[in-house]
Each structure stands twice: as C-alpha cells, then as structure tokens.
C-alpha cells in the first residue's frame, strides 16, 4: 500500500473527503484522483483511503476494493451490484463499507435493499464457513435520512433471510451509519479502531424475544 501512503497521505485523504459535500468540487476530485471515474466511484475510493488510516494502515486496502482499478491503481468503475463496495477481511473480523453519494431521500430507493442484502449474505456466509469472525457493515454517506438511521438499527432486532439460499437466516445484522465528516475524525483514532467496532456491536445488541417469523401468516389466518 505504498502507493496510498505516497499519493494519499492522511491529510490529503481528509481534504478530498471534505470536497464531496459540494458538487461544484467534482472537477477537482476528478483531476486529482481519476479523470476516467465517476465522482461516485471516486467517493468509494476515498472512503477506503480514510478507512485505511482509521484502521491504523494495517489492512490490505487495494485487495479489499470491489471497484475496478487501473494499472496505476486509479479507480475506474464502481463495485458491481452483487457485493459490497469494500470488504475488509481480518483474522477476527470482517468489515464491509457501503459508500454512497445519494442524498438522504434517494438512499431509501437506491440503497436500502442492496446494503441490507449484502450485509445479510456476508454474515450468513461467514457463519456457514464457521469463521467465528465478527461481521460489521458501515453505511457511509454525506448525509442521512433519519428513517434510514433507524431502519438500520431496527434490522438488528429481527431474523434476516439469505437471498442466496432461502433456508439460511441470521440475526443481529449490524449496519452502522457514519457520515463523511465523522469518518474524517475517525482517521485520527486508529488506536481505538478495535474498541470502536466492538462498541458498535454493543450498541446494536438487542434482546432476543424469540421473534416469530410466521407472525404475519398467523394473523392473516385469523382474519381471512
């Protein structure tokens, strides 16, 4: 990751991250990062760089990207729809980053389904493989709709079904919203990286009240 450290030192990463809040900065971003990529793709790329510093530079960032990189390690095309934008595997944890420049209203239409699907499928995949790794998704955007924030929290309270194998379910899916400015601050907290992720999981712990997956069917049978 010497390329990242040389072209994108910490302060440059912060500077670039701050530019996304104003779309008049699009040309600056393309000029510095990649003229061949969309600004949305560049956002995924820069979010990864910020996370690299938050993680204390210990992750293999370039292999964690699901976006397409050029021979010069410049972003070209954003991640495809079947997988998360950035998936970081470590011995004890898997962190998935889902980054979007959609505004708070558009996120409901464009992000709720794929982010949830990717998060559920990744967690179930890890459970099937018996890895025992902690799985966390961070949903990163410049702004959030309050319903988006609360929907992600509520998801942890109910069993979720795999879209790959309908026989498989998982619980306590963790999707934590973090905005761009908050991520920028976190880049200076690499010594707290593991603790912060553990704290996120504690925040999402819910009481398991034996959620009944057949609640709707049972009710409908009574009224129809």
Protein language model regions, located:
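Catalytic core segments in nucleotide and nucleic-acid processing enzymes
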Residues: 2-224
